[in-house]
């Protein structure tokens, strides 16, 4: 995990649409989440995003634009979902950053 990112940092997640039939005028939704822990091989565990009280399930392989609100400032990166699971009452996903 990047040394500028800390456990507990708030993040915004935006899905990257890869379909050719996506309407370019459609505004993409931004979802809030939080960094929970470091994962293996520089991955990280984050909470599954919630919007209007509902969990937004993101598929394994889904590419994302991620904005980190850290103590060192705003950081943006592309990421991919490499796993998802439930731990207790929390729905989590493991993401891997694609850009530094």
Features from the language model and the residues they span:
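Structured alpha-helical
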Residues: 1-100
């Amino acid at each position: 995990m990047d040394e500028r990112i800390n456990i507990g940092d708030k993040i915004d997640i935006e899905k990257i649409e890869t379909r050719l039939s996506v309407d370019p005028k459609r505004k993409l939704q931004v979802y809030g989440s939080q960094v929970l822990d470091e994962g293996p091989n520089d991955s990280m565990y984050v909470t599954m995003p919630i919007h209007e009280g509902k969990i937004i399930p993101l598929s394994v392989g889904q590419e994302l634009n991620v904005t980190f609100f850290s103590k060192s400032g705003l950081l943006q990166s592309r990421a991919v979902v490499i796993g998802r699971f439930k731990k207790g009452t929390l729905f989590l996903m493991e993401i891997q950053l694609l850009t530094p």
